[in-house]
Amino acid sequence: MVTALFLRASHQTVRPTGLRQCQAAASRLGCNASLIPGVKKGQFPKIQMLSTSASKLQADTLDRTRNIGIIAHIDAGKTTTTERMLYYSGFTRRIGDVDEGSTVTDFLPAERARGITIQSAAITFHWPPQAAVNLIDTPGHADFTFEVMRSLRILDGAVCILDGVAGVEAQTERVWHQASTYRIPRIVYINKLDRDGAAFGRTVREISSRLAGYPAVCQVPWFEGGNGRFVGVGDAINLQGLRWQDGDGKAVKMFNLQELDGEEPGLAQEIKRARTALVELLSEHDETMIEKFFEHDEDHLAVPPNDILDSLRRCLLQEQGRKIIPIFAGASFRNIGVQPLLDAVTNLLPSPLETPDAEKKSVTQAESQNAIEKLQSCALAFKVVNDAKRGVLVYVRVYSGSLDRNSAIFNTNLKITERAPRLLKMYANDAVEVDSIPEGHIGVVAGLKHARTGDTLVSYAGNKLTPPEPLDTLQLRPIQVPPPVFFASIEPHSLSEEKKIHECLALLLREDPSLHVTVDEDSGQTLLSGMGELHLEIARDRLINDLKAKATMGRIEIGYRECPLGESPVVTKMFDKEIAGRKGKAGCTAVVEPFDPDNAPPVPEDALSVETKEGNQIIIIAPELQVETNRKGIEESPVLPPGLDMQSFRASLHNGCLAALARGPQFTFPMHHTRVTLTINPTEHLFGTDTTPAALSSAARLATSAALRDLLSSGPGTSLMEPVMNVIISIDEASLGAVVHDISSSRGGHIVSLDEEIPLTSTDLSASPQPVEDLPPIDPKKVYAPADPFESGSVGASLPDTANRPRTITAKVPLKEMVGYLKHLRSLSAGHGTFVMSVDRFEKMSTPRQKAVLTELRGGF
């Protein structure tokens, strides 16, 4: 049973009509259960704080822990809401302000200067005193999608904040779908209801149509006199009105339904309608609620608040079918509605006990129970930060056991063991040393030299350097890294600075794996690639201002790709040189050909290894290796030289081939849609102890590079590919025609849909099927939503077809045409248009377009 933290007030007994669809089920469900007594009148004082203590629960126990994130479109009020949460929980003594640069979670100089969140910040507070909330404030800008993705990976629940004026925006939909991939339960908080043009009812209907869920309206906005200023909320769960007093928002006056009937009759009726709709909706998805409804004589208002909270929680945790989305209201900047939102976090969102990681669970339920008993902790490194004072900090989420200070940590991805000399509990930019990080919690390990984002870390009992099977191969689901589409050159001020530049870049890449660094072999130029222009600008600021690198970043350009137009001749190359004072010799044969992931030819049956990554496919063929599997399940080959096992054999060839594919033969851009077949003949290509992993890797690189060059000299050549973006544009009805015409004619794009749900792409983490994709769309007219103060028509009426009606355009547009598009969109839409975009695919360019791009890249020559 979930402890109810919402305050209750006395309510009238009103008998509305029964459930429309559940009368026939009465006998089957057994309606003769005893009634649960209602709340007594006068149980609570008029003015008090909204949070109460749950004395039966001990502090920081796992079932009272919440790992939550704040997700939303940029400028929806994420950081503002977070600052109020910290203030009301007692963590801070004053409310931070985004405009003043005084917030706790936005502590980077670039964040305070720009007034946006760039880096997700973790902070722990208590609400009420016995419940621990580990909160992560995430960025809203599309350029920092990876920062959101790696935060979502370790969350148990999330609060999605919507702007009550703008409604459901494009980036909101995108992050919502990413959260759906990880099946994260979410509640929605409609913010900024104090602003002119705010429309709570319209936003609720947009949630049903654009976020593909059933809105469960738990609160309705309280406008003074029905259409005056926003002063509080009507609580449909506890049947009361909450009115915030002016000031810091700590003083709240509560009104029961009887009092509201006299002072605000319109609000009282709306609360009753909201409660009726809430019980009806829950009854359609939760059989227990049907039983409770009949136990209370089919009286919607008589169902106790605890039962409604329990039902909401059960519906939130359902994995199958369409989700119910609890809706709350407020205006964080005016200090209205944040405390009930905190109550909803602890009441409705799950604890770590209810969301175990699937990979860890499958291993701990395996047959090797003797090994499992030695597992002391299992954690995922989801973020790495280089702190000027504390050194490298690795943020971890502990999924099992307790991570203790000075324990040996085995990295199952890198196969290395490190010590954890210091453990920290982070409070944004401040830290407190702790002796351990318990299961279900988020903390920081300081002093790790090798751990990266996405690595799995395990500690185990015993003195062995590596843990026993299967712990040594346990890997939690990694964090997917989207492909970069912009790049810029990095030039050191002098040759003496070059080494430090590369050390600083290595730190940047460890912090942010969505950045990529490549070095041009011919010119020696270093290129930094990222997700967007702002992403690279922030990386430049971090490199130069924070890491004190003496370098200059060149102009930001688009990252094109190169693809083969046909098959290359068969090429064999031998590598015979000394590597670090040791002789190395190996050979390899390579063939390069086009590769279409959607229509790929069959893979040879004798293929030793097939790996498809970043649009390329690498096939390794070695039919004479005589590969066998031993009793431990490890592949062996008697033909391989001593000291070379099958795993390192495959990895060496694969890495060498990848190094060659990073640079195309004609335009020097990375290869894409390319299949490489590497063939190894043991009698011709392996030379005993001289064939080391480094020699094999070099041979594969030489053979692949030669095959790519032969595409130009004696083959069909290569073509340029450009990134095509999936663009979602939010505008009003009046601007629709101009924007559609601009996209389809001036920018060479094509319109995919108008006002439809965003299609998932590879960069939206669509690794698993969405649970709602086959369900019919929800009709917004059938969704309960309170009438907005200036809305005409009945409750739930569809939006009027006016010039201000919000519209959404989904289009496919070449990235080159989208550079600097925001300024142009604002001019077309009178300043109201916004857009987000993600990489959809790379597409082969036409000859005239390729010629124009090359001329531009060469400076007009």
UniProtKB/Swiss-Prot annotation:
Cell location: Mitochondrion
First-listed, main subcellular location of the protein, grouped into a coarse class: mitochondrion
Domain tr-type G, residue spans: 63-353
GO BP terms in the entry: mitochondrial genome maintenance; mitochondrial translation; regulation of mitochondrial membrane potential; ribosome disassembly
Family matches, as InterPro entries: EF-G-like_DII, EFG2, EFG_II, EFG_III, EFG_III/V, EFG_V, EFG_V-like, G_TR_CS
Any one Gene Ontology molecular-function term assigned to this protein's record: GTPase activity
Residue range of the transit peptide in the UniProt record, numbered on this chain: 1-17
UniProt keyword DNA damage, yes or no: no
Keywords, in A-Z order: GTP-binding, Mitochondrion, Nucleotide-binding, Protein biosynthesis, Transit peptide
Residues involved in GTP binding: 72-79, 137-141, 191-194
Gene Ontology CC annotation, any one: mitochondrion
Cited function: Mitochondrial GTPase that mediates the disassembly of ribosomes from messenger RNA at the termination of mitochondrial protein biosynthesis. Not involved in the GTP-dependent ribosomal translocation step during translation elongation.
Family: Belongs to the TRAFAC class translation factor GTPase superfamily. Classic translation factor GTPase family. EF-G/EF-2 subfamily.
Annotated protein name in UniProt: Ribosome-releasing factor 2, mitochondrial
Naturally occurring in which organism (per UniProt): Aspergillus niger (strain ATCC MYA-4892 / CBS 513.88 / FGSC A1513)
Gene name as annotated: mef2
